Amino acid sequence: LGTSKPILRPNFVVNRSGREIRELLKFAPVGSDITFVVCDTETGEELESFNPLRSLPPASVMKAITGFYALETLGPEFSFQTRLMTNGSINNGVLEGDLILVGGGDPTLDTDALYDLSKLLSEFNLKTLTGDFKVYSSDWPSINSIDPDQPSHLSYNPSISGLNLNFNRIFLEWKRKEEGYSLSLEARGLKARPSIEGIKVKLSDRTSPVFEYKKLQNNETWTVARSSLGQTGGRWLPVRNPALYAGQVFQRLAMEVGIDLPAPTVIYSMPKGQILISYESETLKSMTKSMLKHSTNLTAEMLGVTASSNFSPVSSLGASSHKMVRWLEERCNLNGVSLVDHSGLNDQSTISAKSMVNILRDSRMQIQIKPLLKKIPYRKKKGQKIFGDDIKIVGKTGTLHYVSALAGYIDNSKGRNLVFAIFVSDMRKRRNLKNHEKENPRGSTSWMNSARYCQRLLINRWCRL
């Protein structure tokens, strides 16, 4: 594709010469910007660096920072609460009043959790109600998407609300039939797979774009280009009205256990009444570990916004991430940090390798986040370890098209412990992507392979320092 140099295997002697670093960096993608720093974890001595103050996008490496911010601000045992409330009473199977589904900001709430809530509600012998079924997303800001420059159909760029469901996604499945295709949209869980009325999908005879989205009042509609579909398949699509989506899914689940609810209505002020049932999420520590493993953007944004809201209300991701930067500045020596989100999905969020390393060196960061990071197993082709058991590498990766980031810790029981950050990007290539190229641009795979190989060479080198 001609976008990167071929990946060669250099033969060099490991030493700490500037010349060797320059030779090694020749294996990075052509024309890319690079910043890296490696230092002694305990003393802070900088061992090697390249453009240490250059600010580049950290991509999902940002999630390690957000996790630290949330755990320190809210505490590892913090959990989110989703509640069913009422302003009436149940008599002879009839709720005389309203039923309200109240979100508590839980980014991991799913169809199975709502299924469990509906089963618990049925234990009240409720059959119907005289009032309304309402949904309330609490005081969290409602945000249409994390990064407005991303294509509308990417499920990893969802809306954000105080009432989220299935990471604010719905599953589209298509099946080839003799007369064409059958399409379905489901709020898929392990216990239930309800369809809802508020989100629809239709086939289109256009050639491009593959997906097109429209929102009219409370209804969301997707159209899919017929020519883009294969035999049978499926993918997640984002939901742009998550509170209503959660309400519609709960309405269907309640129907399955014999409770007749009216169509949900979204309300915008805190309802009065008593709690019938409360659903508690997993602990923040467990949620953060899962976020770092699976790199879920919605979780990162909700953890960051919730932590910022602990100080004062926030109205946007930018305002929330700015609070996080100010909080970090009080504890770490930062230079070249400009953040607009908590997940790193937006490439306008940038940080220098030097600042990233300073954050990773923070003693509380090492207590809170280091044990939650994934092991980075550098092995030869046949599975042999490059290094012995005396060396352990953990870290967080970050990937956008033409952005590759890696930061973490190298612990050596026979030597010194290190902390490192490596950011590689080509923002010119990224900025030149047309909208239809943004999901899978030509040349991005070879670019990414080259960037990751360069990162691996640096890690291999530092393990021998």
Question: Model-found features: residue ranges?
Answer:
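Active-site SXXK
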Residues: G44, P58-P76, F133, L163, ...
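Small-residue-rich helix-loop
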Residues: L47-S49, E301-L465
